[in-house]
Amino acid sequence: MSIIVDNISYIYEKGTGFERQALKNVSCAIEDGEFIGLIGHTGSGKSTFIQHLNGLVKPTEGHIYYNGKDIYEQGFNMKELRSRVGLVFQYPEHQLFETEIFKDVCFGPKNLGLSQKEVEIRAFESLRLVGIDDNMFYQSPFDLSGGQKRRVAIAGVLAMKPDAVSYTHLRAHETDS
């Protein structure tokens, strides 16, 4: 797996009176097995950059390549990219929506067209990996502490078995149990 970011720039609300440059001429290569950290002040473009890695945001200028293919070329499989590059945002607990923890973590893999058995195995393994006890699987995620909610949301991303996971605001994912 490789992601190449080639000279991307991004302008919010381009062509309006509210235009704001978030990224300017950013380039990097992320290879399989690498850990990359982004450090910067609030509003410096870290989250905007991360959103480019799986095509949630299209650069104003420049290109992004996944395994050698431009992700914005016609025919590129964006669904596969998004299943391979997982994003965990600053407040991942805001992406929880199901009535039970286990159902919430099953949502992503289920949408990959996997068998029910494979979906459940992935959910189980991911929840265990982030330290959620089996006896909590059928509780509402909304009854959990903030740290537990974050871990459930992270399990949902991990259950997709992405090649890469990008965390915005990694320190925000430290848990309080």
Outline where the language-model segments fall:
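Single conserved hydrophobic/aromatic residue that forms the stacking wall/gate
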Residues: H169-S177
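A short, flexible loop at the N-terminus of ABC-type nucleotide-binding domains that lies
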Residues: S2, I11-N25, Q74-N77
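Conserved ABC ATPase "signature" region
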Residues: K117-N135
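Conserved ABC ATPase signature
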Residues: S140-L144, Q148
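The feature captures the beta-strand-to-loop junction immediately N-terminal to the Walker
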Residues: I39-H41
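Helix-to-loop junction immediately C-terminal to a conserved catalytic motif
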Residues: N54
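Conserved ABC transporter NBD signature motif
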Residues: G62-E73, L81
